[in-house]
Amino acid sequence: MKLIHKLEPLWWILFGAGGFVIGFVLPALILGVLLLGPTSLMADGLVYHRAIRLASSPIGKLFLIVVPTLGFWHCAHHLRHFALDIGGHGAAALGAFGSYGLALLGTIAAVAAVLAL
């Protein structure tokens, strides 16, 4: 059995968790930060010192790592299956290594950026 098939449950877990994050958490984050933040509905909610304090806390750092990382893995799984649909089994390995490699690079970049806070 190929390694990619042995790791398939891991990819599906990351895909499902990423789908949840993209479907539920990201729209709420966009609503809160981009739409309600500039209005008076969240008075002093997004001032700099409160935002940096939240981002520097352990829960904030975990949130800033988990949300983009799971989104990367969700998109990587979609890209892998897209490559499989377009190129057949000949492009499956390249699509898998390419998409999951990009997701891994995105994960490393997200962790490095958050740890630099």
PLM regions with names:
Residues 1-117:
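Membrane-embedded alpha-helical bundles that constitute the cytochrome b-like, heme-associated redox core
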